[in-house]
Regions:
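Solvent-exposed beta-hairpin/edge-strand motifs
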Residues: 58-75
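Short, intrinsically disordered N-terminal pre-domain segments
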Residues: 1-26, 30, 173-180
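Surface-exposed ligand/attachment interfaces on beta-rich extracellular proteins
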Residues: 48-61, 110-117
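Amphipathic alpha-helical segments that form the core helices of the histone-fold
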Residues: 24-39, 150
Length: 180
């Protein structure tokens, strides 16, 4: 779904004739960042390798939102003995660490771009933009519609979260009928 399609959805949902492009882009970027922070499955995961010395603070990448997992020296086991503060990380032992983290998406700058979050969250993104536009427009005083849009937005976020977690499962249990 492109930003233009999101704008068309918002205009149709609210019954407006026009919405300034700068607000569409601003709202899409704000909600996209919010969804990536609130829901791991909405954002993109990236890895970063650090060679660290014990007790030394090392800068995390500038696009890092949150560290999800850390592995030491190409181990398959999760390493948890580290501290994160103010965009820096400190380890209690020397070594090479691979950090898996959530990264900020690239912000959209044009109406023909597709937002960089998981496609499952695009409906929630559209409803969030509709809610923000209804709140921004001072002449739109229908609080019932605003609250309904907010409920739809939060419901769409939760639905997308459950759909994303269901799609991650590689195997599903199949019930077999009794043999006899």
């Amino acid at each position: 779904m492109t930003v233009q399609e999101i704008k068309d959805f918002v205009l149709n949902k609210l019954g407006f004739k026009e919405m300034p492009d700068k607000y569409v882009l601003q709202f899409v970027n704000e909600i996209m960042d919010s969804l990536a922070i609130d829901y791991d499955s909405a954002g993109k995961k990236t890895t970063y390798t650090i060679t660290a010395t014990k007790g030394t603070w090392t800068d995390l990448p500038s696009d890092c939102i949150a560290v999800k997992r850390c592995f030491k020296d190409n181990s398959e086991y999760n390493y948890d003995d580290f501290i994160i503060e103010n965009g820096q990380i400190q380890f209690n032992t020397d070594g090479t660490y691979t950090i898996e983290y959530l990264a900020l998406q690239s912000h959209v700058t044009a109406l023909n771009e597709v937002p960089g979050i998981n496609i499952i969250f695009h409906e929630a993104l559209s409803l969030g933009v509709a809610y923000k536009e209804a709140c921004r427009n001072f002449m739109y005083d229908n609080d019932t519609v605003k609250s309904q849009l907010y409920v739809e937005y939060t419901s769409a976020k939760e639905t997308a979260k459950s759909r994303a977690s269901n799609s991650k499962r590689s195997r599903k249990r199949i019930k077999y009928a009794d043999f006899f």
